[in-house]
Regions:
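Alpha-helical recognition/docking segments in bacterial nutrient-uptake
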Residues: 1-99, 165-166
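Short glycine/serine/threonine/alanine-rich loop segments
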Residues: 23-24, 72, 110, 140, ...
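Glycine-rich phosphate/diphosphate-binding loops that line cofactor/substrate pockets in enzymes
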Residues: 103-112
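Flexible loop/turn connectors
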Residues: 160-263
Length: 263
């Protein structure tokens, strides 16, 4: 089961490759808020499903529990819950945010600000941990970082950042953004207000979406190997299907900085 999120296309390519390699047939289902999960799970089992890849980016613990009781092997992708015994393949969000923030500091020699998502999910909170860790490691005070809470979409972040600028709130010399969409929207608002990027304000994003190369200037960001992430998730699911072991694992996919022109 997957939800429709921005990196779904590349992730699904990896899942498809992994399934073909393991000789599994892939069926993609979309689940919506009002769907009866128990009924869907029963139907999948009736149709002979061997396992479930669950893209849980925006899911909470109570959303996951029906899958842990369904009797089928499950691998959770892009989320993790310490209280649930469940295999997962996730992004090393803390590492990525740390690398991005550390790079910002070394490029600008300035206290970084944070374009933080106003919509809270596990991944963004892990990125917040990485952001503040980099600040502490560079001998800076976390309390001095300017934080703006912006909608995690291009249009939403653009409108929110316009409001921040109009209010006269303090702006930072450089910003780490929770994702590329927030970065793109904020950059547009800053540019329209007369700020030059990166000469006046530097910005770095997270996810390395295709749009990054089309933004002016091209957006520096954190690359997540989404296709590889999908392949690894299938490999782990196949191991569970073919094993009697009850041990669960958490696999974190490492990230890397992509240096472009925004910082």
């Amino acid at each position: 089961m997957v939800q429709d999120v921005p990196f779904f296309s590349q992730l699904s390519e990896g899942i498809d490759l992994g399934c073909r390699h393991c000789h599994y047939y892939l069926n993609i289902s979309y689940i919506y808020e009002n769907d009866d999960i128990e009924t869907l799970l029963s139907e999948w089992k009736r149709l002979g499903a061997k396992g479930i890849l669950l893209l849980g980016t925006e899911m909470e613990k109570h959303d996951i529990k029906p899958f842990t009781r369904c009797g089928l092997p499950v691998v959770l992708i892009d989320n993790y819950f310490e209280a649930l015994n469940l295999d997962c393949v996730t992004i090393n969000n803390l590492q990525g945010a740390y690398l991005a923030t550390d790079y910002l500091i070394k490029q600008t020699h300035a206290q970084p600000g944070y374009l933080h998502s106003s919509y809270i999910i596990t991944g963004f909170e892990e990125r917040a941990d990485g952001f503040y860790k980099a600040i502490r490691k560079n001998g800076m005070s976390t309390s001095r970082s300017v934080v703006h809470h912006l909608s995690p979409t291009v249009d939403g972040a653009y409108c929110d950042m316009k409001a921040v600028i109009k209010s006269g709130d303090e702006l930072a010399r450089c910003y780490f953004a929770d994702n590329d969409l927030i970065a793109a929207g904020a950059m547009r608002a800053l540019s329209e207000a007369g700020y030059r990027i990166p000469e006046d304000i530097s910005v770095i994003g997270f996810d390395d979406m295709p749009m990054c190369t089309y933004i002016t200037p091209p957006l520096s960001t954190v690359h997540v190997p989404k296709q590889y992430m999908g392949e690894i998730a299938v490999k782990r699911l196949a191991e569970i299907i073919n094993s009697t072991s009850a041990s669960h694992v958490k696999i974190e996919i490492s990230t890397e900085i992509i240096k472009r022109k925004s910082c």
